[in-house]
Amino acid sequence: IVYAVDGSDKKIVGIHPSAKKSYEASIFKTLAPDLENVNSSFVDNNFNVNFEEVAKLKPDVVIIWDYQPEVAKKLKELGIPAVSIKYGTLEDIQNGIRLLGKILDKPEQAEALISYHKDSEAYFKQKNASALPNKPKVLYLQNKNLTVAGNNSVNQLMITMTGGENAAKDTKGSWTKVSMEEIMTWDPDIII
């Protein structure tokens, strides 16, 4: 999100390993080649933070999701400012984009990105208005530990916006570990 709002990779000193992995397989590798050297070893895939490594990066601010209050508290104790962005709906993400626009002194770019989000959402809603009544059941697996995108995840929104039904929609929270038996009971049509 910082890159999208700022239009540059120059202010990014660290990113989550999953963001780094996505970067490796995306057009951002061409658009922002310097991100290849950005540190991602200060946090693991489960968002467990090595605070000593964060301090070595000397960030001006750390952007975290709102479900990480203990991380914000520890960063504050270390004198490192943290900004929490609410994770969940597209509106939450858009509010986070707006906040980053203020922090990065790029409010116009933030509003343009939000406008793009809203236009994209409207496009998919219109396209899916006449979708088939039997929506495919889609299961989004995060990792080999059978962690699924639940009803509070952005992935839930993406699945429904594109005409699917989240097979794990009845799970609590954003990400939930489940059993193979649960997956078999859900009988998803598509697994991502």
Please report, for each region that a protein language model flagged, where it lies by residue.
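A short, structured surface patch at a secondary-structure boundary
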Residues: V2-A55, V61
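Short hydrophobic beta-strand segments
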Residues: G14, V62, P136-L141, I191
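Short beta-strand elements of ligand-binding domains
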Residues: I15-H16, I63-W65, V83-T89
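Short helix-initiation/N-cap motifs at beta->coil->alpha
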Residues: V38-F51, G88, T171-M180
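Proline-aspartate-enriched helix->loop->beta-strand connector
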Residues: V43, F51-I64, I80, M180-I192
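Extracytoplasmic substrate-binding proteins
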Residues: V71-T147, E165-K172, K177, W186
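Short helix-loop-beta junction
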Residues: N155-A167
